[in-house]
Amino acid sequence: SSAFQSENAGLVDFVGDEASILSEIRKLVSILPANNEDEAFDDCEDDLNRGCDGLMANDPDYIISSISDMNAFVEVKKNYAPSMVTGFIKLNGATVGVVANKSTDAGNVLTADGCDKAAEFVKFCDAFSIPVLTITNVKGYLATVENEKRIAKAAARLTYAFADASVPKVNLITG
């Protein structure tokens, strides 16, 4: 089912009725560049010196929407590995991929599924020349038997994805 593929396999970006899925796809297509060689810029009239009062909050959704143009954020694979947030924003008109760990969901730790989700997303951004912003607030790795089986390889894949990416990368440490 689409719910299983979304929550357990990470193969589906959006789940819902036809109207909501089409709405999300339109948002995604509008924020992505037409191809990997096009510049991903739009005009922006947001105040570049705007304040972000809740920036110290442990809620990456709030931080991401606060810093993005027009507070717009298109999250992808929301239901898969929910402790890791991936999606797209515009910063001063430029499309930027965002990776953030949702510290409130997993106690400030990384999971193997979250690392895999982030690695796949970084590779996608690199393929389309989209810069990556990482918002980090993490203490370590989730200590469960199931996670311990996969975390070393997953963390290595994530590290390699960042190291191999040729796009600009910025890390914002919030905790």
Language-model segments: what does each one mean?
Residues S1-G175:
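Ligand-binding clefts of soluble mixed alpha/beta catalytic domains
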